[in-house]
């Protein structure tokens, strides 16, 4: 440092000499040059957070720009340290805003390392497309927490970094205009099934009543509706019973015999009854049983004591009916044989003839074995 003395006696300020070499080196020092790529390289030793000031560590960049935007650098550099995509790089991703695919791994790509459908595939190709997809990125917590040393971590390291997806699949993912997973083929199919199940579950008779995803505004079957349903059933049962009783009241003896003759269980006894009644009505002037009907004492006593035993057993046939059954006359089902046609006296005559026949045979059956046709008259009057 040189000190100059003026003629007046005053001392001037000291002059400091600095070599030009140091000025040039300080101006061109790497610490004075600031660039995003340099900051990215300096911060590669620790995991990036959304809380940091690095623009390459934000959620939006990671989901929609990382390994998607083309790198513009002309010099050769390490692709693993660059956040942009390069030609032929395996970590290259498809833009989820342009290509609609889900966060599920493509089975064909995982087996063979390539997919025949290419960019049109509806599934993720590779780890970066799978875990950086808007439907999966930072939706789970990192097992290492704040001590994570990964360059690019797909998981959250704090509660503030944890991304909570909207509950409705039809809403778009925050940060992208077309990054909704609901537009993929698989999700569209699942949404259609969900809507179908939702519509079907609103039906009162549906088995999917308890499988509805969204609760309905009102219960599917209120107590008032249950009471109405039971009242409708009660009214229906009463109407059926009334109809059955009226049909039984209007049923004549001939119609009952005709209906019972078609059943294999009651065929023998009903056919014998029809034949006997037809012959008795045609010969009521003679007041005698037909000569071809041979009724023994024992068989008649068994028939009068238990008339339902033969009707309820399909294998048991009275002895007097073996080989003696004949088809009823063609006019048996005519109007002249219906009790409503005015031939009620035929039944009285037949009853009187049967009583006289029992008297002629001179056997005692007892009070319980007498033929009582009074209930027939009660039904017909």
Swiss-Prot record:
Give the start-end ranges of region Disordered. 1-39
Complex and partners? Interacts with MARD1/FLZ9 and RD21A via its CCCH zing finger domains.
Q: What is this protein called?
A: Zinc finger CCCH domain-containing protein 61
In the UniProt record, the signal sequence range is none
Q: Where are the zinc fingers (C3H1-type)?
A: 101-128, 137-159
GO cellular component terms listed in the entry, alphabetical order = cytoplasmic stress granule; P-body
The residue ranges flagged as biased composition, category Low complexity, are: 21-37
Q: Which InterPro entries match?
A: Unkempt-like, Znf_CCCH, Znf_CCCH_sf
What would you give as a GO molecular function for this chain, any one? DNA binding
Keyword Nucleotidyltransferase appears in the UniProt entry: no
Q: What is the lineage of its organism?
A: Eukaryota, Viridiplantae, Streptophyta, Embryophyta, Tracheophyta
Where is it mainly found?
cytoplasm
User: Where does the UniProt annotation locate this protein?
Assistant: Cytoplasm, Stress granule; Cytoplasm, P-body
Could you list this entry's UniProt keywords, alphabetically sorted.
Cytoplasm, DNA-binding, Metal-binding, Repeat, Zinc, Zinc-finger
Q: Which Pfam families match?
A: zf-CCCH (PF00642), zf-CCCH_AtC3H23 (PF25512)
């Amino acid at each position: 440092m040189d000190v100059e003395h003026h003629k007046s006696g005053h001392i001037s300020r000291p002059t400091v000499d600095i070599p030009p070499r140091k000025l040039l080196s300080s101006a061109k020092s790497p610490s004075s040059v600031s660039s995003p790529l340099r900051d990215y390289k300096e911060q590669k030793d620790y995991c990036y957070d959304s809380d940091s000031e690095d623009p390459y560590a934000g959620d939006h960049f990671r989901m929609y720009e990382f390994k998607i935007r083309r790198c513009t650098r002309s010099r050769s550099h390490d692709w693993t340290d660059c956040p942009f995509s390069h030609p032929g790089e395996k970590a290259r991703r498809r833009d989820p805003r342009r290509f609609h695919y889900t966060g599920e791994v493509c089975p064909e790509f995982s087996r063979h390392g390539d997919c025949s459908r290419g960019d049109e595939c509806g599934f993720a190709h590779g780890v970066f497309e799978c875990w950086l997809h808007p439907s999966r990125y930072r939706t789970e917590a990192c097992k290492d927490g704040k001590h994570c040393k990964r360059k690019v971590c797909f998981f959250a390291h704090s509660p503030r970094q944890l991304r909570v997806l909207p509950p409705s699949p039809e809403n778009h993912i925050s940060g992208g205009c077309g990054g909704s997973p609901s537009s993929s083929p698989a999700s569209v199919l699942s949404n259609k099934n969900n809507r179908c199940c939702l519509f079907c579950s609103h039906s009162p008779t549906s088995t999917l009543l308890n499988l509805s995803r969204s609760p309905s505004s009102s219960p599917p079957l209120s107590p008032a509706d249950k009471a109405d349903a039971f009242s409708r059933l009660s009214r229906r049962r009463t109407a059926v019973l009334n109809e059955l009783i009226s049909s039984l009241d209007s049923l004549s003896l001939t119609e009952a015999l005709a209906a019972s003759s078609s059943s294999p269980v009651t065929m023998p006894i009903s056919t014998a009854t029809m034949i006997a009644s037809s012959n008795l009505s045609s010969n009521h002037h003679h007041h005698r049983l037909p000569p071809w009907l041979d009724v023994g004492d024992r068989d008649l006593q068994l028939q009068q004591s238990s008339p339902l035993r033969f009707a309820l057993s399909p294998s048991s046939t009275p002895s007097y009916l073996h080989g003696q059954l004949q088809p009823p006359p063609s006019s048996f089902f005519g109007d002249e044989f219906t009790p409503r046609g005015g031939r009620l006296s035929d039944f009285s005559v037949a009853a009187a003839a049967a009583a006289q026949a029992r008297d002629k045979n001179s056997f005692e059956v007892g009070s319980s074995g007498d033929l009582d046709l009074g209930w027939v008259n009660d039904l017909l009057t």
